[in-house]
């Protein structure tokens, strides 16, 4: 195996996650009680023995850069190799932003040269999965491919959300369509690629000089390689757990899968650990009057109420008489006494008063954005404060940084929203 360098695409805005990504990039979104989404890709790298990693940031990079730091939690603080944050290059003839996924890697060819790359892994930093990249690389080398794309079969009705490929009997890709309205196959790209470096360099330079390209791997680079027969691309079929948590519903579902009696995604595998940078906190405390079942409760949490089928992050406090069901409550959120929360996602550093009810009543279409907020789930943005005695229905949205005075009424009907007043 040649020298492998991983390039993690971590600049995504994640607009379909609504208020959850208003202030942070999608790869920085908290997940699973203590992690951020990028932790899974970084952990897969080090568990696969890949210690040369570039993280390509763009949209709101501050939280992500602070989280990764010098890479110590992932054993990536190394003199030889390690992790490097790669923001867009700003020069006299360059824009401040990467123009697409392919352009992002193109702008960092120098980083690949400096690290003597022979094979380049191009990875998304916002999916939840466990993969030994050596299996992908071994398959790539066995086939003598120029590039190999990890893929899996998805339900045909969902296929139009993915890059879809058609292969021959040998596994060679003969056609690729990015998010086709009428898919001819259900073999979906996972956004995980390995390329021979010299081949990748050549096609990226060609793509950069193409005025008609949007400089995206799925939309432009991969289809052109196939269309013009520029190289051999193979499909590596992955049969493990992989989730695209790019919508509010899929994010909520993937979190709650973790509390199933036999979860499809194992956070506890001693042979494939997931690492993160998190604050040191004392053990979780469950009070004598508290009741908990089928939940993840992270360190530093204090539970004085009832928690069922939920994911409770670090430093969360749940007051006496409060009931939390089917919900995701993120770091350092405080919930007062005698509250009721069901089917709710609450972001970081939220303060919820006493006697607050959330996720109650009949479901209704979102008045804010029905394409993003598709029903059932009520979402609260980070750094918000919800005053005492407020009743909030289903499919409601509380924006980022909302203050008590932003609530014009004590009862928010299902589908309604509260946003912070513009200063």
Swiss-Prot record:
CDD domains, per the entry: ADP_Glucose_PP, LbH_G1P_AT_C
EC category name: transferase
Gene3D superfamilies in UniProt: Hexapeptide repeat proteins, Spore Coat Polysaccharide Biosynthesis Protein SpsA, Chain A
Pathway assignment: Glycan biosynthesis; glycogen biosynthesis
InterPro entries referenced in this protein's UniProt entry, alphabetically: ADP-Glc_PPase, ADP_Glu_pyroP_CS, GlgC_bac, GlmU/GlgC-like_hexapep, NTP_transferase_dom, Nucleotide-diphossugar_trans, Trimer_LpxA-like_sf
Keyword Electron transport tagged: no
Described function: Involved in the biosynthesis of ADP-glucose, a building block required for the elongation reactions to produce glycogen. Catalyzes the reaction between ATP and alpha-D-glucose 1-phosphate (G1P) to produce pyrophosphate and ADP-Glc.
Family: Belongs to the bacterial/plant glucose-1-phosphate adenylyltransferase family.
Subunit structure: Homotetramer.
NCBIfam families: glgC, PRK05293.1
Official protein name in the record: Glucose-1-phosphate adenylyltransferase
Chain's gene name: glgC
